[in-house]
């Protein structure tokens, strides 16, 4: 299954980007052994409207335009469900084993995801009730994808 990350906004060069890149590279190397191929990161321009609702709609339509029919979609959103790393690995494994060919994990803009997009997602995932900076969400997502690959392969990186 090809896995890509779609993120509203651009991540500037710096230590956060380097750390995120390091985890995504680890995932890219370890994922193929368990049928997960990292297809990269797509950055989506932030909405420019004065209204938060309009920005959500604009960003949501740009994200929607990037999705192929049949794409599995996991949205990262503070209103989502908190899962353990093992549960996330199980969910991604189920999508893979269920025949899904493409999975997009999407990081929304500052206003969150458009409600209709949340409604169509296979999973709305939260990294907890706290609000996280976009840069750290990318780092945490990269680490969790790497962890998912290690869990699915039985690698000792994840020692739960």
Curated annotation (Swiss-Prot):
One GO location term (cellular component): cytoplasm
Claim: Methyltransferase is one of the keywords in the record: yes
Binding site for S-adenosyl-L-methionine: 76, 108, 127-132
GO MF annotations in UniProt: rRNA (pseudouridine-N3-)-methyltransferase activity
UniProt-listed CDD domains: RlmH-like (cd18081)
Enzyme class: transferase
Keywords of this entry: Cytoplasm, Methyltransferase, rRNA processing, S-adenosyl-L-methionine, Transferase
Chief place where the protein resides: cytoplasm
InterPro entries: Alpha/beta_knot_MTases, RlmH-like, tRNA_m1G_MTases_N
The reaction(s) this protein catalyses: pseudouridine(1915) in 23S rRNA + S-adenosyl-L-methionine = N(3)-methylpseudouridine(1915) in 23S rRNA + S-adenosyl-L-homocysteine + H(+)
Compartments in which it is found: Cytoplasm
EC number(s) recorded for this UniProt protein: 2.1.1.177
UniProt-listed PANTHER family: METHYLTRANSFERASE, RIBOSOMAL RNA LARGE SUBUNIT METHYLTRANSFERASE H
NCBIfam families in the record: PRK00103.2-3
Functional note: Specifically methylates the pseudouridine at position 1915 (m3Psi1915) in 23S rRNA.
Subunit structure: Homodimer.
Family: Belongs to the RNA methyltransferase RlmH family.
Name listed for the protein in its UniProt record: Ribosomal RNA large subunit methyltransferase H
Organism: Mesorhizobium japonicum (strain LMG 29417 / CECT 9101 / MAFF 303099)
Gene: rlmH
């Amino acid at each position: 299954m090809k896995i890509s990350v779609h993120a509203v906004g651009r991540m500037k060069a710096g230590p956060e980007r380097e750390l995120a890149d390091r985890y995504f590279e680890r995932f890219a190397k370890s994922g193929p052994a368990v049928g997960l191929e990292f297809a990269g990161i797509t950055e989506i321009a932030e909405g420019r409207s004065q209204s938060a609702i309009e920005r959500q709609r604009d960003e949501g339509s740009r994200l929607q335009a990037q999705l192929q029919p049949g794409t599995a979609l996991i949205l990262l959103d503070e209103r989502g469900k908190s899962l353990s790393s093992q549960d996330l690995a199980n969910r991604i494994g189920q999508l893979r084993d269920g025949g899904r060919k493409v999975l997009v994990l999407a990081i929304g803009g500052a206003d969150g995801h458009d409600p209709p997009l949340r409604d169509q997602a296979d999973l709305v995932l939260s990294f907890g009730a706290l609000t996280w900076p976009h840069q750290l969400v990318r780092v945490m997502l990269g680490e969790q994808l790497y962890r998912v690959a290690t869990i699915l392969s039985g690698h000792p990186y994840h020692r739960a």
